[in-house]
């Protein structure tokens, strides 16, 4: 387990070989490449190196997703979602030619940013969760495959002031855990979210009110998972998922964490257990809460743009 700072935690652990790639997707819609062997090798108790110091990020650019890739195979896709409700699916093979300065993975409109990226097989169900508590579940096949320069298509219709806060690739065995800024949350069965066509307004995933506040996160969890709750003031609370109520969609949830009136919940995530062991012949790559940072070099300019669809 990594010896981490008091205000940080491990939320993802990848088992990777030294020659595997790490695709680092940023809020600006760019992707950068790292080889696993480029990461500093250290003992189990070492803190590691901030990823922002290893990539030529622009001022304010954040790494929002890291995908480990062993082979760039046909039939696999990179699925992306933005805060303004745009989604895009691009063949993984289109990310097989690394550039030191990075490339554009998604052409973003003004005031939009990339929130998350996942690798899929093209046959999964996708869920988007908004800050207003709305959730939409649709077939991944509803999103046609596009090149890197395309702007994507509408995944969910949002009202003014609303943002997509979570992209989830559905696992039928899991449950959806949603949490709000005033410390409330709940679990809901995946089957309670019926698939519909992409681009709609979705259904109520959790009731939002002055009492519980806007949604700050939604993740898929198993009954034996643990999660970390992070407040704006820096409070971290670790809790077991099986102690959180499983209720229907149209409810507000229960108290997950006691929040001071001047504080807010800002993030939730699954926590990787410190007892997880490395696989033989492979390295464990840990991704914690990534820090914001700046770099001097500008990224590569992609060739042309394509208008998005609705």
Q: Which residues does each predicted region cover?
A:
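Short, structured "edge-of-domain" segments at secondary-structure transitions
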Residues: 1-310
